[in-house]
Amino acid sequence: NPFNPKTTIRYEIPEYSVVTLKLYNINGHLVKTLIDGDQNPGSGSVVWDGTNKSGLRLSSGIYIFIMRAKSIYSNKLFTSTKKMIFLK
């Protein structure tokens, strides 16, 4: 799944939830928060343009995103972790 210059991250939310989608480098350092807020159930997507939280273009490498969705109603926690390869 190498990408350049941007990629779309698609996800499914089973219940109305508080959602965070955070991107980390291979060393585990937070690069950027892509989503942080309430989301309705269903399909969603977010575009990552290869930049960090300061808007600077990142170097080629492996990046990991972790999505956490905590249901507002049932308090269930849903998580998903994926790996992406960014090529300049």
Predicted regions and their residues:
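Solvent-exposed serine/threonine-rich low-complexity stretches and specific carbohydrate-binding patches
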Residues: 31-40
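Residue-level detector of conserved, well-ordered beta-strand and adjacent loop positions
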Residues: 35, 49, 85-87
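Short, hydrophobic beta-strand segments
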Residues: 48-54
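A glycine-anchored, Pro-Gly-centered beta-turn/N-cap motif
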Residues: 40-44, 59-62
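C-terminal tail/sorting-segment detector
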Residues: 10, 59-88
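Glycine-centered coil/turn sites that cap beta-strands in beta-rich domains
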Residues: 2-25, 33, 45-48, 69-75
